[in-house]
Curated annotation (Swiss-Prot):
Belongs to the prokaryotic molybdopterin-containing oxidoreductase family. NasA/NapA/NarB subfamily. Its cofactor is [4Fe-4S] cluster; Mo-bis(molybdopterin guanine dinucleotide). Substrate binds at F792. Pfam families: Molybdop_Fe4S4, Molybdopterin, Molydop_binding, TAT_signal. This is Periplasmic nitrate reductase. Residues 1-32 form the signal peptide. Component of the periplasmic nitrate reductase NapAB complex composed of NapA and NapB. Its EC number is 1.9.6.1. GO terms for cellular component: membrane; nitrate reductase complex; periplasmic space. It comes from Shewanella oneidensis (strain ATCC 700550 / JCM 31522 / CIP 106686 / LMG 19005 / NCIMB 14063 / MR-1). InterPro entries: Asp_de-COase-like_dom_sf (IPR009010), CT_Nitrate-R-NapA-like (IPR041957), MoPterin_dinucl-bd_dom (IPR006657), Mopterin_OxRdtase (IPR006656), Mopterin_OxRdtase_4Fe-4S_dom (IPR006963), Periplasm_NO3_reductase_lsu (IPR010051), Prok_molybdopt-oxidoreductase (IPR050123), TAT_signal (IPR006311). Residues 38-94 form the 4Fe-4S Mo/W bis-MGD-type domain.
Length: 826
């Protein structure tokens, strides 16, 4: 057998990818565990949104090993390096086991020292603060910041407690920082959220196009499947677009490093190329799409008095007007190859190669994107533009033809999006500012008409501003570390946490940066210390049983939310006019109205087939099943169908809609989606007319650009070994040793021009602050001249405090990828 040099290099890239995934590292450890009297059970991985299934090995009440689940259709027995060390995330030396309240002279004090207290004292203190705030300032003075790492029932309980209990929509998940632009993109184009394709498309595509997605490190199991397809199919090609070279470039046939923000130009160029070269699928476009012109100059989601916001003509305006195909073609006609090459810095032949792949009617194309597209001040537009390309060519919802938005958290889809824990959303894609949607939800929740406020609550970035301004006073964060992960910490977030008017509660297993800035820390159960359910990026809902007990004193987020609701009588938090509609509720607790409501509490604990279920034992009913079934009723018959609860414990997950116990691989297409009738071909049924929208949207610049003082673009992101802020992975000795400290990746010539060498300590500064770190001029990430990259996992180097809190005005998602900085020797 002969092999070309190019194929040899590609094969080496695959080996490198497998090594990065961690396939070979812990084999001996796993083999040893097989014969050591360990009990194994399934669970989805605790980390990213891929949704790998792992087998969890327990012994003597402790998780002692994890390995890839060979029965999983997602990861097929593989784990990435983080997945292999899951068994250690719960056993950090500084695990919290008792509530900690800031106290001075025996009572709570904002400037006091953290002091151990009982759960009763913690909840009594919290409840008193909440009741006082609601009574004196109204329900909008309380709020919560949650997580795409919540289980489905935790997110549902949190949303219901706030929207129907405390009468506030001031609840938002950290998925606002990562997936909000994807959500709004789906809703604008299709009228319904989440991908139409599935992971099976990885085995069918001819071309893979990565848009701001370093899959080799951030989604390594999917990258392994993609690599296998590339190396086993001689005609398969990989195109990678990024603002700097990363490990995904190792497999790229068509690598492209573009200037920050110019992806918008490239996307419109491709649409123009398709039209100019008569590659439009005219039949598909005529039958299944329509065109619209979006509003431009929409601002940057900053405070209203910010100069950039005052300058915008249409701040936050997401409206559009119908146009014809010819008008759309004229709109994109100015986005020529020459203009795209000039704006992006990418060689014209590479751009044309990419455009030809999309335009070729015989080629199946899978577009994959994540934070590079979403964490973008025009992230919604970028999502819409990606769909434009697939809709113009009809390359959508068939095997290998898939515009696929990747998620970063294990249940950003299943909990944050599907459950509706955003400040503007309700379950099953309903929204709070729609009268009909509120009425449906109020009926399902058995609360009076008018219970749910019609105005969206404070989104993530706005929560920080309102804390600082003293308008949001009681604030509970769960399952997230926003003081490290969020933007503009110095100017907005930290002042809000330490505002003397505010009482801040953080639920976390560990003393994170966020926890240490709070007034009360609540110790939390983790992962398989509780029963859970996640929903991954391909609409797969996957459940697990509790497999070990949490350390004594640590309680799950679900327990905390439901137990806290017992502290409130309806009459203490609802106005008289609302109680008058349901006077029988006046003397009841929120717990009785929201959770012991005859629906959630109707399933006995004997229904639970797992060995443990501490929450259900405490509440004396199968609380997880009850919440799930109440929640699932929202989507059944409405395109979001979930299977019966018990089915998920029997499987490695099912992809919704699940109709007649059959999952759906691809949506909107006849023969796969049960909501598409025979003879329709396609039906984008999220829209009343069944047609998807192709948007005419322009290029607009970033909120900030480098200047004479801050002369470098900086992007922040992740690395393979750590997940998000490292609050779990940095406590795993093997992962910490593999990557102990963050560095700033620079081009060698940029370092030389500043008198710097690899390993030098430097100051990195933006208009909002500065940090110390060390220079890396080699290694896995290779920025071009003028660009630097720094990961945000290191709690000792809070790089995101340099980031401006500019957001996409439509999705309110922060742009973490484009910040002007200067780098100097420390």
């Amino acid at each position: 057998m002969s092999i070309s040099r190019r194929e040899f290099l590609k094969a080496n890239a695959a080996v490198a990818a497998a090594t990065a995934v961690g396939v070979t590292l812990p084999v001996k450890m796993v083999e040893a565990a097989e014969s050591d009297n360990i009990k194994w059970d399934k669970a989805p991985c605790r980390f990213c949104g891929v949704g790998c299934s792992v087998l969890v090995g327990t012994k003597a009440g402790k998780v002692v090993a994890t390995k890839g689940d060979p029965e999983s259709p997602v990861n097929r027995g593989l784990n990435c390096i983080k997945g292999y060390f899951l068994s250690k995330i719960m056993y950090g030396k500084d695990r919290l086991t008792t509530p900690l309240l800031r106290m001075k002279d025996g009572k709570y004090h904002k400037e006091g020292e953290f002091t151990p207290v009982s759960w009763d004292v913690a909840f009594d203190t919290m409840a008193a603060k909440w009741k006082h705030s609601i009574a004196t300032k109204g329900p909008t003075s309380v709020g919560m910041f949650g997580s795409g790492q919540w289980t489905i029932w935790e997110g549902y309980a949190a949303s219901k407690l706030h929207k129907a209990g405390f009468l506030t929509n001031n609840i938002d998940p950290n998925a606002r920082h990562c997936m909000a632009s994807a959500v709004v993109g789906f809703m604008r184009t299709f009228g319904i959220d989440e991908p139409m394709g599935c992971y099976d498309d990885l085995e069918a595509a001819d071309h893979f196009v990565l848009w701001g997605a370093n899959m080799a490190e951030m989604h390594p199991i999917l990258w392994a499947r993609l690599s296998d397809r590339r190396l086993s199919s001689k005609d398969c090609r990989v195109h990678v677009l990024s603002t700097f070279e990363n490990r995904s470039f190792d497999l790229a046939d068509n690598p492209m490093v573009f200037h920050p923000q110019s992806d918008l130009v490239i996307l419109n160029y491709i649409a123009n190329y398709i039209i100019q070269n008569k590659a439009v699928n005219t039949d598909f476009v005529t039958k299944h799409t329509k065109f619209a012109l979006g509003v431009d100059d929409i601002g940057y989601g900053l405070r209203p008095d910010h100069p950039l916001e005052k300058k915008a003509k249409n701040p936050g305006n997401g409206k559009s007007t119908p146009i014809s195909f010819d008008e759309y073609a004229k709109f994109v006609s100015t986005y020529t190859l020459e203009y795209a090459a000039k704006m992006s810095g990418v060689e014209p032949e590479k751009l044309e190669t990419l455009a030809k792949a999309y335009a070729d009617p015989k080629a199946k194309v899978m577009s994959l994107w994540t934070m590079g597209i979403n964490q973008h001040v025009r992230g919604v537009w970028a999502n819409n533009m990606l769909y434009n390309i697939h809709l113009l060519t009809g390359k959508i919802a068939t095997p290998g033809n898939s515009p696929f938005s990747l998620t970063g958290q294990p249940s950003a889809c299943g909990t944050a999006r599907e459950v509706g824990t955003f400040a503007h959303r309700l379950p099953a894609d309903m929204v709070v500012d729609n009268d009909k949607h509120r009425a449906i939800t109020e009926k399902m929740w058995q609360v009076p008409e008018g219970t749910i406020p019609p105005k969206p609550g404070y989104h993530a970035v706005l929560q920080s501003r309102m804390l600082k301004d003293g308008k949001l006073n009681c604030y509970w964060t769960m399952c997230t570390n926003n003081m490290q992960a969020g933007p503009n910490i110095n100017e907005e977030m930290y002042p809000g946490f330490r505002n003397p008017e505010n009482f801040i509660v953080v639920s976390d297993p560990y003393p994170t940066v966020t926890a240490m800035a709070a007034d009360l820390i609540l110790p939390t159960a983790m992962w398989v210390e509780k029963e859970g359910a996640y929903g991954n990026a391909e609409r797969r809902t996957h459940m697990w049983h509790q497999q070990v007990k949490a350390p004594e004193g640590a309680k799950s987020d679900l327990w905390q939310l439901v137990e806290f609701s017992k502290r409130f009588k309806v009459a203490e938090v609802w106005p008289a006019e609302l109680i008058a509609k349901k006077p029988e509720y006046a003397d009841k607790t929120l717990y009785e109205v929201l959770f012991a409501n005859g629906v959630i509490n109707k399933f006995p604990t004997t229904d639970c087939k797992g060995d443990l279920n501490d929450e259900s034992e405490h509440f004396s009913f199968y609380v997880q099943k009850g919440i799930f079934e109440e929640y699932a009723a929202f989507g059944r018959g409405h395109g979001h169908d979930l299977a019966e609860f018990d089915r998920y414990h029997e499987t490695r997950g099912l992809r919704w809609p699940v109709v007649n116990d059959k999952e759906t691989l691809r949506r909107f297409v006849e023969g796969s989606d049960p909501y598409v009738k025979a003879g329709e071909g396609y039906n984008f049924y999220g829209k009343p007319d069944g047609k998807a929208v192709i948007f005419a949207l322009p290029y607009e610049p970033a909120a900030e650009e480098p200047n004479s003082e801050y002369d470098l673009w900086m992007s922040t992101g992740r690395v393979l070994e750590h997940w998000h802020t490292g609050s779990m992975t940095a406590r795993v000795p093997e992962l910490y040793r593999a990557y102990p400290d963050a560095q700033i990746f620079m081009h060698p010539e940029d370092a030389k021009a500043r008198g710097l060498q690899r390993g030098d300590e430097v100051l990195v500064a933006s208009p909002r602050g500065e940090i110390k770190t060390r220079v890396e001029t080699k290694g896995r990430n290779k920025p071009p001249r003028g660009v630097v990259f720094m990961p945000f996992f290191d709690a000792r180097q809070l790089v995101n405090k340099l980031i401006l809190d500019a957001t996409d005005p439509l999705s309110k998602e922060t742009d973490f990828k484009k910040c002007p900085v200067k780098v100097m020797k420390a």
